[in-house]
Design a protein with these regions (language model features):
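A detector of single, family-specific signature residues
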Residues: 1-352
Length: 352
């Protein structure tokens, strides 16, 4: 039986005629790790370009391939200006788009960052990089692409700091797991008698072990008076085998755990300084909270409640279930401009 010819790659001319070009000076860019394919409006005037190695010898004059070095990014911006492009659409692929986006925005282009799923869902999408950038350009010129949400530039800086801070916490957590592993390999049952080994009792005992203390009775005396287990029970749990290789692993893991917490404190100082620059004018200080609680291991080292109040003008921690750490992360991701969503229902839908 003869195969039916597919018409998926050929747009219906009747439908195409009904679509109006809304962005006549739009370009489309297909972003990759090693190359960037750029398509400007067909008919845009530009100087001729010789094909780069590995690039098809026959390319439409409005399509070019660039590398991803900084000089290549500047070359893209120069070509777009030459072609009188004012707005550029690209997919948010990994982190490869960030340097080009920053450069284009800083040089006056309007950049439309698009969720890749939006472009993929559009029918008739081609499968090659050469055609992909043309497809993005065409969709953008017809006004069929919607910008992905991005907070304002100061908020994006804050978001980067917060995400880096989360990575530091994750790295510190890995070394805490290695501390627990080394203790278990020496049959030191500290986690069984102390609910949180990063607390006062747990860390006092671990640091004493690293300093050379092996006597279970002496180690048990380091327990905090609020510890539920008795000194005798803790002493029995601390009768370890003390193999040198596991002691060495414990020593190094503790040093790395401390190092990442030092980096956390440095990160907190940078975040606090950045929040000072985001503060609204003439916002009165909050009254001190009556709640008294012990500071948690990974909490920020500055008064986040006050800083957030100066940024937003309201006390976000007054919302039930919202603590300082939660408010810091959420606000750094979405910013303070709630007008981006028509209503709280739209905001909730965007959150998923």
């Amino acid at each position: 039986m003869a195969r039916r010819k597919s018409t998926a790659s050929t747009p219906d001319p009747t439908v195409a005629a009904l679509l109006q070009t809304l962005n006549p000076h739009a370009a489309g860019i297909d972003v990759g790790a090693t190359e960037l394919w750029v398509c400007v409006p067909p008919g845009a005037r530009s100087s001729p370009c010789s094909s780069a190695p590995g690039v098809p010898t026959v390319l439409p004059p409005h399509v070019r391939r660039f590398g991803t070095f900084t000089a290549d990014l500047h070359a893209i911006a120069a070509w777009l200006r030459q072609c009188q492009v004012t707005t550029v659409a690209m997919e948010s692929t990994g982190v490869y788009w960030i340097p080009l986006d920053d450069l284009l925005e800083s040089t006056g282009f309007q950049v439309l960052l698009v969720d890749p799923r939006q472009v993929q869902r559009a029918p008739n999408r081609p499968k090659t990089d050469v055609h992909d950038c043309q497809w993005i350009q065409r969709l953008h010129s017809l006004g069929l692409l919607t910008a992905a949400f991005r907070p304002e530039e100061p908020m994006r800086v804050w978001r980067s700091y917060q995400r880096h801070r989360a990575n530091l916490i994750e790295d510190a957590g890995r070394h805490l797991q290695r501390i627990e592993k080394a203790l278990e390999q020496m049959n030191v049952k500290l986690p069984e008698v102390v609910s949180d080994i990063t607390g006062l009792t747990g860390m006092s005992i671990i640091r004493a072990i690293v300093r050379g203390e092996r006597d279970p009775q002496a180690l048990a005396k380091l327990r905090d008076r609020r510890c539920k287990e008795s000194a005798a029970t803790i002493a029995r749990a601390l009768q370890g085998t003390w193999q040198p290789e596991h002691l060495f692993a414990l020593q190094q893991s503790l040093a790395l755990y401390d190092y990442y917490h030092e980096q956390l404190q440095a990160c907190d100082r940078v975040i606090e300084e950045h929040l000072k620059g985001l503060a609204l004018p003439e916002v009165p200080a909050l009254e001190p909270t009556r709640r008294v609680r012990r500071r948690r291991d990974n909490e920020v080292t500055f008064d986040a409640r006050q800083r957030l109040h100066h940024v937003t003008g309201v006390d976000l921690t007054a919302i039930e279930g919202i603590e300082e750490s939660t408010a810091l992360v959420v606000l750094s991701e979405i910013g303070t401009d709630m007008s981006r969503w028509p209503s709280e229902k739209h905001f909730g839908s965007w959150l998923g």
